[in-house]
Amino acid sequence: MSQGPPPGESSEPEAKVLHTKRLYRAVVEAVHRLDLILCNKAAYQEVFKPENVSLRNKLRELCVKLMFLHPVDYGRKAEELLWRKVYYEVIQLIKTNKKHIHSRSTLECAYRTHLVAGIGFYQHLLLYIQSHYQLELQCCIDWTHVTDPLMGFKKPVSASGKEMDWAQMACHRCLVYLGDLSRYQNELAGVDTELLAERFYYQALSVAPQIGMPFNQLGTLAGSKYYNVEAMYCYLRCIQSEVSFEGAYGNLKRLYDKAAKMYHQLKKSETRKLSPSKKRCKDIKRLLVNFMYLQSLLQPKSSSVDSELTSLCQSVLEDFNLCLFYLPSSPNLGLTNEDEEECESGYAFLPDLLIFQMAIICLMGVHSLKRAGSKHYSAAIAFTLALFSHLINHVNIRLQAELEEGENPVSAFQSDGTDEPESKEALEKEEPEPEPPTVVPQADEGRKSRKHSRLSCLRRRRRHHPPKAGDDSDLSEGFESDSSHDSAQASDGSDSGSDKSLEGRGTAFDAETDSEMNSQESRSDLEDMEDEEGTRSPAQEPPQARSEVPDSLNGPLGPSEASIASNLQAMSTQMFQTKRCFRLAPTFSNLLLQPTTEPNSVASHRPCVNGDMDKPLEPASEDGSESEGSESSNRSCRNERSLQEKLQALMAEGLLPAVKVFLDWLRTNPDLIIVCAQSSQSLWNRLSVLLNLLPASAELQDSGLALCSEVQGLLEGCELPDLPASLLLPEDMALRNLPPLRAAHRRFNFDADRPLLSALEESVVRICCIRSFGHFVARLQGSILQFNPEVGIFVSIAQSEQESLLQQAQAQFRMAEEEARRNRLMRDMAQLRLQLEVSQLEGSLQQPKAQSAMSPYLIPDTQALCYHLPLIRQLATSGRFIIIIPRTVIDGLDLLKKEQPGARDGIRYLEAEFKKGNRYIRCQKEVGKSFERHKLKRQDADAWTLYKILDSCRQLTLAQGAGEEDPSGMVTIITGLHLDSPSALSGPMQAALQAAAHASVDVKNVLDFYRQWKEIG
């Protein structure tokens, strides 16, 4: 600006003002003319005429001149008029009249051109604003103005601070408009710009993270994806932003109304048998709809009844746990193209990002209820902690699946450890598989493909022979079971594998199914979340919280907060409670209490490992959520994987970001940790497992990994309760300005330049944060976790436990093999209808009449399976019995399969159930030396078979310690032989029946037993 006399100085601003007013009048006139055009009934036919397009172009030019001439006073107004009159109103007009616009018509072509032109204009405007004001947005967006490198310096900018602020926000709004235009493009046929629109919105957030408007647009873009859960997350983020968008409240309200309608429709829908793929889709739909409905009830102004809320919380937790077992490309389900088509309308698994969003939704709900002083605050806290417990448990299961890949399962009935050297040798010989590039579950597929059941091998050998006339029965048709389709797929899958014979040991079939035998329900009540299905029964109404909640949760609870603390403990106890009543065969409980390597070392005084004191460890709960085996340290595993393999598994685990965020939130709320320490014990048990799975800082520092200096510096403070510094991770950037994490994010400088971390370095930073949190919790009062530096592990301890940490660590080492098997079992049970089975179990086996009159364990013989398979199937699907299949019975079916179609049907049925993981049908492996009656086998095969089955019954009911229950009435052998006239039976058979009676084992004809069961009802 040239220096001139005072009159000249005063005249220039005056001329600028006059020019500005003249421009503004021209803009208003153009807007008025465009409004007249849009008022016509046939406006959609007129809007793209050349004169109207020219008018819009003129208005656009005037608005651009106006905003740069006087940005402070007219910039925002000019932006708004430009967007609404030139682009938005035209778009809305076309969308309103889309029924009149035919595909590939001239109007549709003009509309597409309109959208493309808008995107081009706003990209150009974005670059021009950056260039004009020399904005540095390289770290925020793709379309940046790059300073001329030949100049070596920036152009001087004479703009005021207010003008610079407008320019920054104008770039933000340009990105939002670009996202909107891409979203409108995405609605057109043949155009897929959803990811582009999403990217523009996130770039707008990076430019102005305090503005919530882009989250509202992201919610609109998400639509009904994942039954509106993704949209709900976006609308909640918008509402909880510093500058929220009013429209998000109405959008969220509409989603909640939809969720309530869908929830009641699902409750009314009849339960019918579905194929495995459809079951998965229905389970996930039920989870997401119920989760949406639950969040609508957990609102500050909600008037829901406490009992309804508690029941719904428990139902959602059950389904959440179940659906986390559903993994992409799960080998157990063997989905064909037909199955995938069935699931096209639904979802077959929960992606990691959706689980992350569900976790953040819970945190946002807790924050809203706390701020409003709602009575549902305690319920929300308890639900969130329980959900986090499930999340950690599944992270443990997935990580252990990777770290223990290739390890041979340990037989559940083996107590002498004779096969251990063979297992170790097999492990040493096996080459490690390459790690999957993306998701962890795919690693399971490689391992599972090498496992074939013995029945699969029998059928595979038979396939080499030419088909006979009677072989039509091999087709898997005519089965009423839900798993018939799955059975066929499983059979085909097994036939496609290696033809290597398993005659020698039969380990693949027996090891997998025997480990499932170890999943029977315990008599004890563990304080965990694993039996939520049992809690579907009407729950106690929790005491209500105070109507007012203090603003801050940080710091110790004062006397005035006692009611909140007691209410929170009560709700947390309800969420983590279990109601289990099943008579466990003594063999199972004794094996759980006594490790295979040192049977007598912990039989009397077993230390409290990870919080379970004086209770048998639980391999798997009824709803599939509990792998309390995963609640002991995996670092004790005898087959340690290399650090590189550990890091590969950790990098591939997509749930770790959610865990890290949860722990950041808990770190800023230590009072919640203390109040819920005892009621949520399984959460800390599982956290101790995760902490022990992670490599320690010394291990990482000594490994020689190529890490940047910032990460190396972070490793030095990894084992401290408070990290001296912290590096920003993608999850931290994504949750910037989120109110529940505001306190946790105070240590971050979001505006400073941050190093670009590799995937490995990001994983190391997460490891540092999680292990530092472990030391932070160990420092809190209440002995929630303790760290033993001697062996380098975290241990979760009950307050009343006085055993030394070293003893507890040793106990964890001894139980490592059991834990590994249990977690493998939990992965393999994904396709079960777990919650239905548990409710059946509790509704039937807890009835005194049924419990006393009928044995819970049934062992059918070969004749029963050959000639009465439909009855066996009904007994198995009733949920009132557990069918045990001894090895002898399988051998008998193998001998009869060539002559008896019933034997082939039995083989097919058992193979399908074992592969599916049915908890009500188990295979039992022979263990130890039994008295071989070779002469009897030649003379009377039926009597010999009964003796062999009786040996299996003894293994099942054998009490290995004092004080066990009387095994009488626990097991019944159901046979296809007629027992009405014992005198008509052979001498050896009569002797076998007497031996069974002496062993307190009932032997009944299958028809008589079935009739008796039906009469009892």
From Swiss-Prot:
Its main location: cytoplasm. Residues 406-562, 597-640 are annotated as: Disordered. Residues 620-629 have a biased composition (Acidic residues). Residues 873-996 form the PINc domain. One of its GO terms (molecular function) is histone deacetylase binding. Residues 448-467 have a biased composition (Basic residues). Keywords: Acetylation, Coiled coil, Cytoplasm, Nonsense-mediated mRNA decay, Nucleus, Phosphoprotein. The keyword Kinase does not apply. The modification N-acetylserine is found at residue 2. Plays a role in nonsense-mediated mRNA decay. Does not have RNase activity by itself. Promotes dephosphorylation of UPF1. Together with SMG7 is thought to provide a link to the mRNA degradation machinery involving exonucleolytic pathways, and to serve as an adapter for UPF1 to protein phosphatase 2A (PP2A), thereby triggering UPF1 dephosphorylation. Necessary for TERT activity. Interacts with TERT, PPP2CA and SMG1. Part of a complex that contains SMG1, SMG5, SMG7, PPP2CA, a short isoform of UPF3A (isoform UPF3AS, but not isoform UPF3AL) and phosphorylated UPF1. Not detected in complexes that contain unphosphorylated UPF1. This is Nonsense-mediated mRNA decay factor SMG5. The lineage of its organism: Eukaryota, Metazoa, Chordata, Craniata, Vertebrata. The gene is Smg5.
